[in-house]
């Protein structure tokens, strides 16, 4: 019997799975998929601080293996008093479903589950799977999708193609398919000097001067002009701190943080060299630290993006845009495992108070997913 994606969404939303807690969401999905013949593995990874629960479920053992990836964890609700309804009530008003995680991304998971439930499994020449992370939004994401992918490798399980249900749509469901993502790298620059009294600058060395010169040059450096699939890389200064509350003291240190969102014309190493060379031109008294959140990648347009575009056209009548804009997602890990593209609901209210999606959009997304599955396995 086919599943109603709205009812399933309401049930999944009712679990307050604020990252990295689970509160029953993974078990609920596992039990639901088990009823449709999926072999489910609830996988827990973590350390002394946290235990993250994930799910890998598979129907069939053959190739190709079409995998849907998503996450059940959600960001905090903020002030729940400002919500129209209880954030975990899954309330519907005026044909709009409200709740934390509706958009990002519980309803997309439910839409794909519902789409699968409409398929005659006997017609599938291959297998369908779900990779569901319990921590995509928080600080323990390494115990989510990356850990599950390692488990798949260790257990000789192969995914041939992955569709991620992140909210990619802009104005209407299906108008945007993500075929790649920009990389993200954080820099911390520390300039050192000599502390002293502002009245005796010759006895001190103000590191602020060097930092101003460094940041000015970085801000005026054009990293690239973009290319066919990516917008230009951009660098944003996010903080500048001296930790000095006294107005008559020259500080001995200044720290600046910046983030670069970069396209496939760069690597984290090439960007480090650019920033490091700028710092070295200005002063020898600096330290440079980096943290890479994810590398840029692209799944070049081909049969899978064509299938998804065709499914969108059939259901909605619109032509989808292929995009690489926006932030990072777990696709940055999956791309090392298999080809991956992303399609989900509109991202307009993701992470916001009164997060919501029209009921019709969820049904429409379910129809798109179903049509994509049929095309993928050549099912009439």
From Swiss-Prot:
Necessary cofactors: Zn(2+); Co(2+)
InterPro entries: Bact_exopeptidase_dim_dom, DapE_proteobac, Peptidase_M20, Peptidase_M20_dimer, Peptidase_M20A
Binding site for Zn(2+) 1: 71, 104, 166
Residues at the catalytic site: 73, 136
Note on how the cofactor is bound: Binds 2 Zn(2+) or Co(2+) ions per subunit.
Sorted UniProt keywords: Amino-acid biosynthesis, Cobalt, Diaminopimelate biosynthesis, Hydrolase, Lysine biosynthesis, Metal-binding, Zinc
Gene3D superfamilies in the cross-refs: Zn peptidases
Function field: Catalyzes the hydrolysis of N-succinyl-L,L-diaminopimelic acid (SDAP), forming succinate and LL-2,6-diaminopimelate (DAP), an intermediate involved in the bacterial biosynthesis of lysine and meso-diaminopimelic acid, an essential component of bacterial cell walls.
The protein's name in its UniProt record: Succinyl-diaminopimelate desuccinylase
Organism of origin: Ehrlichia canis (strain Jake)
């Amino acid at each position: 019997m086919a599943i109603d994606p709205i009812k399933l969404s309401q049930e999944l939303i009712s679990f307050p799975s604020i990252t990295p807690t689970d509160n029953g969401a993974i078990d609920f999905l596992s039990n639901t998929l088990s009823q449709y013949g999926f072999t489910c593995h609830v996988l827990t990874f973590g350390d002394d601080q946290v235990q993250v629960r994930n799910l890998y479920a598979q129907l069939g053992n053959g190739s190709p293996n079409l995998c849907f990836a998503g996450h059940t964890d959600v960001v905090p609700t903020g002030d729940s008093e400002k919500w129209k309804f209880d954030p975990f009530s899954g309330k519907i008003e005026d044909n709009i479903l409200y709740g934390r995680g509706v958009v990002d991304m519980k309803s997309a998971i439910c839409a794909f589950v519902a789409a699968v439930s409409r398929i005659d499994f006997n017609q599938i020449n291959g297998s369908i799977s779900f990779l569901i992370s319990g921590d995509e939004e928080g600080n323990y994401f390494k115990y989510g999708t990356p850990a599950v992918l390692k488990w798949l490798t260790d257990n000789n399980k192969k995914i041939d193609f992955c569709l991620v249900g992140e909210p990619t749509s802009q104005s209407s469901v299906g108008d945007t398919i993500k075929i790649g993502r920009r990389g993200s790298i954080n820099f911390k620059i520390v300039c050192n000097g000599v502390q002293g009294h502002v009245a005796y600058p010759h006895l001190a060395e103000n590191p602020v001067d060097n930092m101003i010169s460094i940041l000015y040059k970085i801000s005026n450096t054009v990293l690239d002009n973009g290319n066919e699939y990516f917008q230009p890389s951009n660098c944003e200064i996010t903080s500048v701190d001296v930790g000095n509350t006294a107005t008559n003291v020259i500080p001995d240190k200044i720290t600046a943080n910046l983030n670069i969102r970069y396209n496939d014309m760069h690597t984290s190493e090439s960007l480090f060299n650019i920033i490091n060379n700028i710092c070295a031109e200005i002063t020898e008294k600096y330290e440079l630290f980096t943290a890479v959140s994810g590398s840029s990648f692209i799944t070049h347009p081909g049969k899978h993006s064509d299938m998804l575009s065709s499914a969108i056209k059939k259901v909605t009548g619109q032509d989808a845009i292929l995009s690489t804009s926006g932030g990072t997602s777990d696709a940055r890990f999956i791309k090392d495992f298999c080809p991956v593209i992303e399609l989900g609901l509109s991202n307009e209210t993701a992470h916001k108070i009164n997060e919501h999606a029209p009921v019709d959009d969820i049904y429409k997304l379910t129809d798109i997913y179903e049509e994509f599955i049929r095309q993928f396995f050549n099912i009439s």
